[in-house]
Amino acid sequence: MPKSTTITQEIIIETAFEIVRKEGFAVLSARNIAKQIGCSTQPIYWCYKNMEDLKAEICKKALAFLQNVMLSYSKTGNTLLDLGLGYVRMAHTEPALFKAFYMDNVTNVKLTDIFPESERVVEIMKNSEECQNISDQELKNDIAKGWMLAHGIASLVAVGMLVYDEDKILEILK
């Protein structure tokens, strides 16, 4: 009797995440996930009632991944500039995920809910030397302005309309 293979939720999530990371949500289906894993669609539907439940799990994983990519970038020592550069770099290195979450809006949220008003971003900025004496409202306004500029650049980079050149992008963001 052949050994049965166990397809876990972790395997399904990781495989689905990699599909979305490479090609976006448009190609995500139980059949494509199963093909990638090398199984039938049955294990996928054993773990998830429907594709919407699976998509919600992928969104959680992807947003945490994208936020980590963006927030871990440090080049200039200026927190706001580094956040902007990290955001544009994320669009360059992860274009399918960037488009899905920040251009196609697969999560149906306002972008201001994700980035400028993010408590994590405000906290990071408040802890930086250059923002110690700035009110929370002024800080949120500065973040929003920088983010709008960075988002425009990142969108152009993600769709291939602007070549990713970090030095030029840094000059624009300054």
Residue locations for each model-derived region?
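Short hydrophobic clusters on alpha-helical segments that form packing/core surfaces
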Residues: 12-20, 28, 62, 66, ...
